[in-house]
């Protein structure tokens, strides 16, 4: 019986509109929010200004709150995406011309997107999985790019936290794996000054993480850090510079290369691979 009802909802646009209206709280401007599907439920979207939220086919978007204040802000959720907000505020934007893109096949759970500023962009590429992750942007012209097949699995309050400010970029390559309680910070958020002349000493800077990198528990990547491909960042490491050697383990405070000629795999092997 339930399958027949769902089939009818999918086939008849009027019934779909009634279903969406019953189980969600969307603005009355129908062209501002384009979301439909039997798994679009218990969401609240608040738009103040000229903004747009678009959702593709076969998505499951449930228990989220989107608050967007400003003009020309866009949220694009592509096909076959799951976003479960557990009744939390999933997206908050305040500013103009900000853009969030979540590509097809992503699985997003208990993850927040926070933007206060203008001309910022967050791109989550195909088949990315996030849990207890925070994307936090302040001021203008910042970008976050997460490569395909990357996983970020925080636990409860031990989140994976991205903090960007002052027009910086954070790039994460494809097939990376993040543990929990991790900090990625392109700015110190406050100023350290030369005592004599008042010159600022801690300028914000970009962070780049190569492909197939594994970031361990409680590690921290600070402004100006670059992690090469096929790198393991050990638990508790604090990275503060550009590392140049691939296939290494980086560990310590401050972090340095402690082992070379390594690779890693998501699978836990009980015996040697070769």
Give the ranges of each region predicted by the language model.
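Membrane-proximal basic amphipathic "stem/tether" segments
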Residues: 1-48, 259, 265, 273-274
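Short coil-to-beta-strand initiation/turn motif
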Residues: 106, 221, 237-239, 255
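Conserved catalytic-core motifs of eukaryotic protein kinase domains, centered on the activation segment
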Residues: 188, 243-244, 261
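Short beta-to-alpha loop/turn elements within the nucleotide-binding domains of ABC transporters
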Residues: 225, 237, 243
């Amino acid at each position: 019986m339930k399958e027949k009802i769902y089939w009818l909802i999918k086939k008849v646009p009027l019934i779909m509109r009634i279903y969406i209206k019953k189980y969600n709280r969307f603005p009355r401007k129908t062209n501002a929010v384009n979301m439909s599907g039997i798994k679009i439920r218990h969401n609240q979207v608040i738009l103040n200004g000229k903004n747009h939220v678009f959702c593709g086919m076969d998505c499951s978007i449930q228990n989220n709150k989107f608050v967007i204040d400003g003009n020309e802000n866009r949220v694009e959720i592509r096909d076959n995406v799951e976003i479960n907000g557990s009744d939390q505020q999933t997206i908050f934007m305040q500013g103009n011309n900000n853009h969030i893109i979540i590509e097809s096949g992503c699985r997003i759970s208990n993850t927040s997107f926070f933007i206060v500023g203008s001309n910022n962009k967050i791109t989550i590429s195909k088949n990315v999985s996030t849990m207890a992750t925070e994307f936090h942007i302040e001021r203008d012209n910042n970008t976050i790019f997460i490569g395909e097949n990357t996983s970020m699995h925080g636990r409860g309050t031990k989140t994976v936290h991205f903090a960007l400010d002052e027009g910086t970029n954070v790039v994460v390559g494809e097939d990376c794996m993040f543990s929990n309680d991790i900090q990625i910070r392109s700015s110190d958020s406050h100023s350290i000054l030369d005592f004599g002349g008042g010159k600022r000493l801690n300028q914000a800077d970009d962070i780049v993480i190569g492909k197939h990198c594994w970031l361990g528990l409680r590690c921290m990547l600070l402004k100006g850090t670059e992690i090469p491909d096929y790198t393991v960042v050990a638990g508790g490491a604090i990275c503060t510079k550009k590392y140049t050697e691939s296939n290494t383990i980086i560990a310590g405070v401050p972090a340095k290369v402690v082992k070379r000629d390594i690779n890693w795999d998501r699978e836990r092997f009980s015996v040697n691979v070769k």
